[in-house]
């Protein structure tokens, strides 16, 4: 299991030097953020990114992510050229020794929260999703702004794309994902790249948009789209646990049994009323996920890939990108590494 940390590039207030000082830290999870979605990432740009990370004594563990263009998700005629570009990016990453790519197939929005700075009684702030608030939000009127999004839309563009998705139900989205997978995975497999689809976050429909990577049944359907370990998943326990109907430990065990876990996101959440939840500190006592059991499964199945603490609270007066501060994620990383050491030594 390789401990890793998300880095948003030169604009990230958390520096590579900061990350390198975290005990047990080995890898960086990052991307090239200024290439428009759908265009090829050149080898030169990948080399520059790789050199910068390695100069800090770290390595690129995972690319998160190479975004999937909306035209691919919508199944538009332009998708073939866009998929060709995606394949070339995969090949360029492989040529530079990068072998794991996290991506998602969520329509329009990446991870979605209703408050980016909910304040806990101790003064720390965290990301939360309030189901009641979400039902009152209108994305067309620009009431959403998230640091994790790869694109921003004008009001007119947002209306147009939301209208386009009105014609796409879950089965049609599955059909479009299948088309993408059958084009991408053979090429990824040929160059030794493991693709890792991230679950929808949260894993249920929002704003009337279809969501399909949502739980155990979805994972079992997904891996059958193309039988290859290159066609794998990102086991984001916080995302899957956000639906109270999901048993995240059952999902985790089954995903490992299928040998399709190519990347792990380990964060905790505290379930609330209905489908509401708050992101919490990583230790089990603060959330609804038994993190010890998650790490135990990683060891039981011999997981050797990258794991990252994913989101964290903002603590100790830190400001910056919500969910992606240094301090709480660093605490999370060392906590997860401590669990891993305890599991290993306890199994002897």
Curated annotation (Swiss-Prot):
The organism's place on the tree of life at top rank: Bacteria
Pathway: Carbohydrate metabolism; pentose and glucuronate interconversion
GO molecular function, one term: mannonate dehydratase activity
Record flagged with keyword rRNA-binding: no
Keywords: Iron, Lyase, Manganese
Coiled coil: none
Catalytic EC class: lyase
Example GO biological process: D-glucuronate catabolic process
Cofactor(s), by name: Fe(2+); Mn(2+)
Reactions listed under catalytic activity: D-mannonate = 2-dehydro-3-deoxy-D-gluconate + H2O
One Pfam family of this chain: UxuA
Known EC number: 4.2.1.8
Record's function text: Catalyzes the dehydration of D-mannonate.
NCBIfam families reported in the protein's UniProt record: PRK03906.1
Family in the record: Belongs to the mannonate dehydratase family.
Protein name: Mannonate dehydratase
Name of the coding gene: uxuA
């Amino acid at each position: 299991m390789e401990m890793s940390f998300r880095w948003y590039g030169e604009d990230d207030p958390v520096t590579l030097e900061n990350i390198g000082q975290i005990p047990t830290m080995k890898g960086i999870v990052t991307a090239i953020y200024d290439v428009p979605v759908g265009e090829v990432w050149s080898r030169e740009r990948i080399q520059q990114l790789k050199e910068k990370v390695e100069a800090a004594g770290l390595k690129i563990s995972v690319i998160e992510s190479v975004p999937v263009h909306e035209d691919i998700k919508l199944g538009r005629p332009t998708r073939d050229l866009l998929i060709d570009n995606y394949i070339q990016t995969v090949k360029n990453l492989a040529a530079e020794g990068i072998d794991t790519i996290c991506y998602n197939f969520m329509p329009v929005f990446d991870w979605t929260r209703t408050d980016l700075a909910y304040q806990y009684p101790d003064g720390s702030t965290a990301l939360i999703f309030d189901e009641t608030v979400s039902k009152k939000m209108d994305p067309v009127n620009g009431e959403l702004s998230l640091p994790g999004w790869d694109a921003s839309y004008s009001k007119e563009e947002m209306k147009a794309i939301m209208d386009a998705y009105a014609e796409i139900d879950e089965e049609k989205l599955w059909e479009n994902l299948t088309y993408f997978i059958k084009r991408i995975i053979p090429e990824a497999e040929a160059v030794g790249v493991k693709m890792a689809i991230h679950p929808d976050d949260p894993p249920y429909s929002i704003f009337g948009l279809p969501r399909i990577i949502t739980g155990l049944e979805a994972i079992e359907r997904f891996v059958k789209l193309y039988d290859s370990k290159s066609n794998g998943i990102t086991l984001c326990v916080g995302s899957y646990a956000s639906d109270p109907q999901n048993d995240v430990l059952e999902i985790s065990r089954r995903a490992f049994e299928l040998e399709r876990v190519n990347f792990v996101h380990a964060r905790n959440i505290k379930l609330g009323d209905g489908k509401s939840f708050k992101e919490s500190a990583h230790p089990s006592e603060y959330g609804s996920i038994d993190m010890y059991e998650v790490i135990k499964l990683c060891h039981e199945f011999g997981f050797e890939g990258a794991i990252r603490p994913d989101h964290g609270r903002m603590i100790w007066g830190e400001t910056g990108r919500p969910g992606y501060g240094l301090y709480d994620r660093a605490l999370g990383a060392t906590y997860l590494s401590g669990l891993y050491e305890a599991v290993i030594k306890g199994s002897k």
